[in-house]
From Swiss-Prot:
One of its GO terms (cellular component) is presynaptic active zone membrane. It is a peripheral membrane protein. Residues 204-266 form the t-SNARE coiled-coil homology domain. This is Syntaxin-11. One of its GO terms (molecular function) is SNAP receptor activity. Residues 41-71 form a coiled coil. InterPro entries: SNARE, Syntaxin, Syntaxin/epimorphin_CS, Syntaxin11_SNARE, Syntaxin_N, T_SNARE_dom. Pfam families: Syntaxin.
Length: 287
């Protein structure tokens, strides 16, 4: 058996002299891809952190609104101060919700652009798609809680009106209050009031005040109605996205199984490689 290790080393030196930058040229496309997406990922991470912070502030504002509305029936403070605080929190929630919705829409566009430019399995496309779904879900939950808080405040106003009507000696049901609210005819309760009955007059004033509060509440709900419609569209689109993600995960599991099989075959081929036997015969210990 002839030792040809020296010939192999000579051929390797000749190849290095002919192609001194061959390895660099081979690896450069991968390096270019990494460097090309680095700045996109940094910008994406900043946007994700911003939306996460905004979502946390939105959730905190919604909780504050719920607590403020709960004080509407039990607090001894002047109702005017409670209403000012409630209106201020509601305006902040509406403004913050619009900002978050715009940022989520921009992230959705970035995800689609990254998928078209770098492929659906690229890092920037997968990260932006997954974070968009998670942040959108958090935003949807916060806005749902906000809607529940406003609906509960509406019920609180109706309960307070019903209490004041009982003070005036008027027994009405919730449906009757709803009808009166829609028609705005609260003066029907002043027909039999005596001039010297200050308590009844105060109760009527309280009812009219609650009616105005309900009108303001309806106005706030109308302001965010368009935002809720846009969120409904996002929910429908997100369902399709989740189905695609589930399919990609299943494909990844299949590819992983195939890769393991290929690795086992490669190990077997390496063990059966005739070059390994040649090197063993060329070893000085066999001389």
């Amino acid at each position: 058996m002839k030792d040809r290790l020296a010939e192999l080393l000579d051929l390797s030196k000749q190849y290095d002299q002919q192609f001194p930058d061959g390895d660099d040229e081979f690896d450069s496309p991968h390096e270019d891809i990494v460097f090309e997406t680095d700045h996109i990922l940094e910008s994406l991470y900043r946007d994700i952190r911003d939306i996460q912070d905004e979502n946390q502030l939105l959730v905190a504002d919604v909780k504050r609104l719920g607590k403020q509305n709960a004080r509407f029936l039990t607090s001894m403070r002047r109702l005017s101060s409670i209403k000012r605080d409630t209106n201020s929190i509601a305006k902040a929630i509406k403004a913050r919700g619009e900002v978050i919705h715009c940022k989520l829409r921009a992230m959705k566009e970035l995800s689609e652009a990254a998928e078209a430019q770098h492929g659906p399995h690229s890092a920037v496309a997968r990260i932006s798609r997954a974070q968009y779904n998670a942040l959108t879900l958090t935003f949807q939950r916060a806005m749902h809680d906000y809607n529940q808080a406003e609906m509960k405040q509406r019920d609180n106003c109706k309960i307070r009106i019903q209490r004041q009507l009982e003070i005036m000696g008027k027994e009405v049901s919730g449906d009757q209050i709803e009808d009166m609210f829609e028609q705005g005819k609260w003066d029907v309760f002043s027909e039999n009031l005596l001039a010297d009955v200050k308590g009844a007059r105060a109760a009527l004033n309280e009812i009219e005040s609650r009616h105005r509060e309900l009108l303001r509440l309806e106005s706030r709900i109308r302001d965010v109605h368009e935002l809720f419609l846009q969120m409904a569209v996002l929910v429908e689109k997100q369902a399709d996205t989740l189905n695609v993600i589930e399919l990609n995960v299943q494909k990844t599991v299949d590819y992983t199984g195939q890769a393991k099989a290929q690795v086992r075959k490669a190990v077997q081929y390496e063990e059966k490689n005739p070059c390994r036997t040649l090197c063993c015969f060329c070893c000085p210990c066999l001389k």
